[in-house]
Amino acid sequence: MSVTLALPSKGRLKEKTLAVLEKAGYKVVLPDDDRNYRARVEGEDDLDILFLSASEIARELGYGSVDLGVTGEDLVRETLAHADERVAIEAQLGFGHADVVVAVPEVWRDVTTMADLDDVAADFRQRHGRRLRIATKYWRLTQQFFSQKHGIQVYRIVESLGATEGAPAAGSADMIVDITSTGSTLRANRLKVLEDGIILRSQACLVSARRSHTSRRVEEIAARIRAGLEI
């Protein structure tokens, strides 16, 4: 039975993933046609490569329609409810680093922690007659972090369809939850990360579907990739 490994379809994630695989001894033979999203691995007839977007990879792993995939941990945990029951993180690959963070306007000088934010959320309801608005593409991670971890209930998530960091200045939200690598975009938009506002430190990971996790072939591929990372 063949194993399907889903890889990022473009950009630096694709390049770095192919380099990790080659280091582990898996040379991916790319198709001549860029519109062909399947590839093969030299000498590995039972290993099929499928190129998808990083978010699609997380979703297909959750469905169990691919056995292994390389995608960001943030996408896995945002896309899949009860992610640890549906997939397993086999290895952190050391690239694609980014943090999912809680950021508020710099002018909120007295707000530096999630506890401060809890007070602000309650005050917003009293002063403005509405809930604190949070712009984000990460609604699941936001709900878990605010409601379950910090007990903050008085807020409303505003779905972000564009540049999330611009939402407070545009007036469509009061603050944001977003992903950042260097923080420069947040600073450019006069936003600051709360001291305890890092929701997740994410990076590219090798992930297996739980239904495939105990497969000897999947275990062998994952072990070989982990060994390659140590070289």
From Swiss-Prot:
It is an enzyme of class 2 (transferase). GO terms for molecular function: ATP binding; ATP phosphoribosyltransferase activity. One of its GO terms (biological process) is L-histidine biosynthetic process. InterPro entries: ATP_PRibTrfase_cat, ATP_PRibTrfase_CS, ATP_PRibTrfase_HisG, ATP_PRibTrfase_HisG_short. One of its GO terms (cellular component) is cytoplasm. It comes from the Bacteria. Its EC number is 2.4.2.17. Belongs to the ATP phosphoribosyltransferase family. Short subfamily. Heteromultimer composed of HisG and HisZ subunits. PANTHER family: ATP PHOSPHORIBOSYLTRANSFERASE (PTHR21403:SF8), ATP PHOSPHORIBOSYLTRANSFERASE ATP-PRTASE (PTHR21403). Lacks the C-terminal regulatory region which is replaced by HisZ. This is ATP phosphoribosyltransferase.
